[in-house]
Amino acid sequence: MKKALATILALVMAIGLCSVSWADDPVTLKVDPSVSYTTAPARAADATYKTIAEAITAAQAGDTIALVNDLTVDGDSYTEVKKALTIDFGEYTMTVAAGGGFDVYSDLTLKNGTLECLKWAAWVQKGAKLTVAADMVINATSTDANKGGITVQNTGSEVTVYGKVTAAGGAAISGIGNASDGGVTINIEDGAVVTNTNDGGLGIYFPNTSNLNIKGGTITGATGIYVKCGSVSVTGGTIVGNGAKADYAYYGNGGNPTGEALVIDKCNYPGGDPAVSITGGTFSSTNANAVGSYVGNNATGVVTGFITGGTFSSDVDAYVAADKIVQKDGGAYKVVADGAITSGTYTSQPTVPSGYKATKNDDGTWTVTKISYYYYPSTSDTTTSTTTKGSPKTFDAGIALYVGMALTSAAGVAFVGKKRED
């Protein structure tokens, strides 16, 4: 009898454990505004909800919420996300005509559709991580300077973009400059498209710590990227400034666009001085220089020496590292290693090896060429009385050059060697 009871108890415990496991398995909850019910259904695979807020309330961490129809969200607020979720838009569009997208307090992935909103599409905070997948499109339409596409704040919060983010306000993607709002990371990956359509808007505004990583994609704004603080790494991608050319002017609550693709603004902001590393990427400005580095708000010493690679629409010699030089290639300026340079045109005097020379041009650039000499050897006729010149020949540098000089005398023809000194 005891053995039977023990067996039954074990089975009951096993069933209970299985029930817990099944309850915690991720499920997909659907959102379709056309469904009708009095009470929202309990969480279950393929349960369908009228609103995305109801689906989020029912969901558990790890679940997926799938749109199965276009969705309009009423009101002027944001939808809170406080559990780790994936929202699959199913190639549909979620429209928030008067409000914003999501207040993000836990990890969230947006994929496979379109989010149209007036205010910020996502406000990422409290250590949450937002991923915008490659098949996701975000459009934030407000033209207010304090609105934009995605903003991120607080230590550990992170935004990673593979898809498309377009805004018409102050910045398409932005940090917040308050001392307590730093410690964030923004990653722009290959294939991403970040665009600000406002004539005075920024592509990315980075006013605080910790990391802005541009690995690829295309970033466009009146100024493409505006940096005040933090660690900035650009290894790839295309950054475009398409705004009107304007002088730098310090602004304590944002950044004034200059038309440049990249602005470094060292200005005693709470996050400290910016640390910038550009090893690759393409920087282009329609109306201004490709890059500008400035000081404001009583700061001193502009940031220099931060460019070691990349291609630019204007000369960036003032900002390259000591062992680098700018090569002018048509209308492009490429940053390359200085030393042992054997060809090309440069915006400052390059270091060339023996046998090559750098010649300064009328426009201030320098062109590197190989040193060659001309001499006229005698013909193949071995008769010493011939005075016929041969065709001009080049003679490599580094070899002593002797130019035959004929002196005619009664005894015949003699040759005197004259060494050319270079």
Model regions and ranges:
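C-terminal low-complexity, Ser/Thr- and acidic/Pro-rich disordered "stalk" regions positioned immediately N-terminal
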Residues: 352-355, 362-394
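Sec-dependent, cleavable N-terminal signal peptides
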Residues: 1-24, 420-422
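Acidic Gly/Asp/Thr-rich repetitive segments characteristic of extracellular carbohydrate-active
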Residues: 28-68
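Extracellular disulfide-bonded cysteine-rich modules/repeats
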Residues: 323-326, 355-359
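Extracellular beta-sheet-rich ligand-binding/adhesion modules
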Residues: 66-97
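Surface-exposed loop/turn motifs in large extracellular/passenger domains
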Residues: 80-88, 102-116, 123-141, 147-170, ...
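A cross-kingdom C-terminal cell-surface attachment/processing module
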Residues: 398-419
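Sec-dependent signal peptide cleavage junction
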Residues: 15-27, 389-398, 417
